[in-house]
Amino acid sequence: MLSLKKYLTEGLLQFTILLSLIGVRVDVDTYLTSQLPPLREIILGPSSAYTQTQFHNLRNTLDGYGIHPKSIDLDNYFTARRLLSQVRALDRFQVPTTEVNAWLVHRDPEGSVSGSQPNSGLALESSSGLQDVTGPDNGVRESETEQGFGEDLEDLGAVAPPVSGDLTKEDIDLIDILWRQDIDLGAGREVFDYSHRQKEQDVEKELRDGGEQDTWAGEGAEALARNLLVDGETGESFPAQVPSGEDQTALSLEECLRLLEATCPFGENAEFPADISSITEAVPSESEPPALQNNLLSPLLTGTESPFDLEQQWQDLMSIMEMQAMEVNTSASEILYSAPPGDPLSTNYSLAPNTPINQNVSLHQASLGGCSQDFLLFSPEVESLPVASSSTLLPLAPSNSTSLNSTFGSTNLTGLFFPPQLNGTANDTAGPELPDPLGGLLDEAMLDEISLMDLAIEEGFNPVQASQLEEEFDSDSGLSLDSSHSPSSLSSSEGSSSSSSSSSSSSSSASSSASSSFSEEGAVGYSSDSETLDLEEAEGAVGYQPEYSKFCRMSYQDPAQLSCLPYLEHVGHNHTYNMAPSALDSADLPPPSALKKGSKEKQADFLDKQMSRDEHRARAMKIPFTNDKIINLPVEEFNELLSKYQLSEAQLSLIRDIRRRGKNKMAAQNCRKRKLDTILNLERDVEDLQRDKARLLREKVEFLRSLRQMKQKVQSLYQEVFGRLRDENGRPYSPSQYALQYAGDGSVLLIPRTMADQQARRQERKPKDRRK
């Protein structure tokens, strides 16, 4: 087999090279079907890529197809698979594709036109653009190709010399197969065809003559080289007919530019930061003459009006439109260019997209004042933002308001309209800028927005109710005693007149064990006002301490708790949003030693916050013993403790108030415990009853099943006994006239059906009479 293959291939190669020098080209389609499977096997060789098929179903040719066993399209012709695919495609809407077949009509050099051969080797299948296409997209591309070439293809003459009459069709097809393999290996027709090399010399001569006559110089030659198309099979070069600017029916580049300027004006104010290293282009205004409006592509267009093809023009147009999505590099060492107002050349465009556009944009100002008709994300008054120079920040809305409780309900618009890389309030530092993919998600502005969401939008809460709700979180008695959330239900204790009880957060300080009797102080005068703490020392320069929102789980926790964690000691936030970029250096982070010291102080402040209001008062009054002793000691020990110290009247009054409130809280805890025990006992009783009910239902089902089985057995026994009974003549009794009756002693009697029916009716009347 190997020797035969080697012998055939060597001879065919020599024969093919000889014919390819003549210029004969053949079609490979006839050898890719089932006409000559042995020759195809010799050419392709046994390969596992062609044998991964279902060999038990190779001869399933009910639909009329004859496929070679090594064909790669064999799976598509299996009858079962094809029918199954058709059934599955019934529930999908499919647009039928338009098949367009195009053949190159050529003629001999003498002028005789050869007829088109649909199934012969003239059907071009290479990637040169003149190909047999199938599908709507390829059909459009083919029509454009035919429109672009037009009559030039007819003027070129024959693509191939006439086929010699000495060669058969099989020889020509085999030569074409091997010649295509040469093309795949990189040896085109230009290696063998002398006429092709002569044509290339003629084309180069025409180019040199045209360069002397025209003013194109280098650009004209490049444009003409772009317009020369090379056929991948024949290797011939032919110029593509480019529609001129006068008779071009599609949109020209100037019209597209005017349309682009009308829709996306590059107006008086630049939308991008200026860059002195970028290419300076004159941006036309409406008052300038139309001649200046074509200068937008000055770096891309040549100095003269060189003829561009349509594809090149659209590429240039798309490069301009991509300038709106480019990224601009900004660093602290860049020197930016700013021109005086009114200068038409004051706008510079950077063509290097690297980093996001709004690097220092204050995104806290992105919440608009109202949703009116002038609702614009980017207002026309957008100003360019220099990074290193001192200037105002980029305004994103006509109303430069920093109020976060505006018409939009303090919704952060930056998360809605900006991508994550734009949604960042980056503070310029001296270090290098590192990419932060989570910068937009964990943005400080977004976290502040979440924490600032007013509770008034859910269930009518106001800040007063929110503060009461915070007190009830840690209060031991404010949750289960039917405490109301209305402002009128706010009760006050004896110490509510203190100045430190206005804005507060609650913390529990009472013990959960009741170890003493309540003979002296009972549960009278109980108040739901829990122990609270001032936030005035925690406000500081920040000003307002927001309520912690219910919508974000992280916002339930006090931010002061997070600051005392060891792995967050190095985290520092710069909240100087409305400062100029030049003033950001003064707001840098403190050194690590200061951070550690600050974290210890914050931890101490956090411990102070955990103390109740009574503990703060006791510490302020310098009471010598703790609140736990005041509340939990029995009466005798408590009196002895008071007698050991010389206390003033104010101190004694505060101690009694603390003990009374603590006893009331412990009594409320015991009351809640009793109620909870009662509820738990009822719950256990209900569960026991439910278990008993389920057990009884199961027993009932079992009894009904056994009763049904007994009835079936009795019925079968009844039919068996009745079928064996015979009269005097030996004939069986009729079931419609006679019936069996069971006696109380176990005997069975045969009675007429009428008497049995009467007895059954009497038995049915007895329960009815008893009910009456």
Curated annotation (Swiss-Prot):
Keywords: Activator, Cholesterol metabolism, DNA-binding, Endoplasmic reticulum, Glycoprotein, Lipid metabolism, Lipid-binding, Membrane, Nucleus, Phosphoprotein, Repressor, Signal-anchor, Steroid metabolism, Sterol metabolism, Transcription, Transcription regulation, Transmembrane, Transmembrane helix, Ubl conjugation. Residues 379-383 are annotated as: CPD. The modification Phosphoserine is found at residues 528, 599. GO terms for molecular function: cholesterol binding; DNA-binding transcription activator activity, RNA polymerase II-specific; DNA-binding transcription factor activity; DNA-binding transcription factor activity, RNA polymerase II-specific; identical protein binding; promoter-specific chromatin binding; protein domain specific binding; protein-containing complex binding. Residues 113-131 have a biased composition (Polar residues). Signal peptide: none annotated. Residues 598-613 have a biased composition (Basic and acidic residues). Residues 682-696 are annotated as: Leucine-zipper. Changing residue 599 to A: Impaired interaction with CEBPB. Residues 191-199 are annotated as: Cholesterol recognition/amino acid consensus (CRAC) region. One of its GO terms (cellular component) is nucleus. The chain crosses the membrane at residues 7-24. The record marks 103-104 as: Cleavage. GO terms for biological process: anatomical structure morphogenesis; cellular homeostasis; cellular response to cholesterol; cellular response to cold; cellular response to copper ion; cholesterol homeostasis; cholesterol metabolic process; cysteine transport. Residues 476-523 have a biased composition (Low complexity). SMART domains: BRLZ. Glycans are attached at residues 348, 360, 412, 423. Residues 654-717 form the bZIP domain. Interacts with KEAP1. Belongs to the bZIP family. CNC subfamily. The cholesterol recognition/amino acid consensus (CRAC) region directly binds cholesterol, as well as campesterol and 27-hydroxycholesterol. Has much lower affinity for epicholesterol. This is Endoplasmic reticulum membrane sensor NFE2L1. It comes from Homo sapiens (Human). The gene is NFE2L1.
